[in-house]
């Protein structure tokens, strides 16, 4: 599917944002570990979260989708033995968290995925879980899928996690730690990539009744065994998805209200609003959401985005239209996402005539020179590339997004929502 974007100015819209992908993943998995049934309200129903839910079903978890919610019934025995490999598509979050989840139970589980997922590393997670007694067999390439988990539960003890490439390695170990046979001391190497997602994991563990103590900046002590509590959970709206709508306001001199969102969000990507303010936008929190207003004139920025790497494609588009040179730093881990996001963003900016330089850990972008592309924008099978470059098409004509259906990974209603910017 190909989508042609028509330029527009002076957008004024009020838009609803779907549930958070990151929180939905974690809520499903913590519910699977719980001692009772859970109801998750406002879950994101998208390719990635469906992959997580389907994998849990293969492991014996009851998952029942309903309009506006999902019911999760944990199995009496952790876990059932799958008759076939558990296929995870291109979902890195599903992969990292489910490997740890499987290791908390008993059984033999094989995980595999799409060719790109087979290129995304899991070695740091495997090494950490092996310190707690888990056994793994990477059946083709060491440290990558396909991979067997030979599960006999986790012992207690000390574990050191190298999460400098992905905070998901640390989140996975922390989520599994309460299920171990004895107290687990989790330490990690710094800096952690995308640390706010780790903070989200800890907050959600606490909400489900798990006791832990963070006695150092890089250490958490988790008493074990503990049981997660079941119950009701409401998933907040996705700040990452909202960012494309905020960027649309910023780029077109618009006024966009997104809801339901709160300044108390667990999501680190909500801090992207502060970046928009630095670039010249006005941000106002209202009763049920946040409003972004812009004149369309943007200032360049020089930023370390290690803690919100998913915002890099969006920021790169804004930088392409800002008045000067912008730099995005400390995001080398973007090279092992759904695509090599640094290379992909740089390549597609070139199609818009935007001078840019790909750095080992980031991008340098000279704004103000964007022109209509002569060829389609290739999202590189990456949902965030497709959505970010759709925003660029609001400012310059002729932008066509190839393989536009890739947005279903995280924001299935993106194109319908995007159309509402014009109404």
Swiss-Prot record:
One of its GO terms (cellular component) is cytoplasm. This is 3-phosphoshikimate 1-carboxyvinyltransferase. It comes from the Bacteria. Catalyzes the transfer of the enolpyruvyl moiety of phosphoenolpyruvate (PEP) to the 5-hydroxyl of shikimate-3-phosphate (S3P) to produce enolpyruvyl shikimate-3-phosphate and inorganic phosphate. Keywords: Amino-acid biosynthesis, Aromatic amino acid biosynthesis, Cytoplasm, Transferase. The active site is at 310 (proton acceptor). It is an enzyme of class 2 (transferase). 3-phosphoshikimate binds at residues 21-22, 26, 166, 168, 194, 310, 337. Phosphoenolpyruvate binds at residues 21, 92, 120, 168, 341, 384, 409. The keyword Transit peptide does not apply. Monomer.
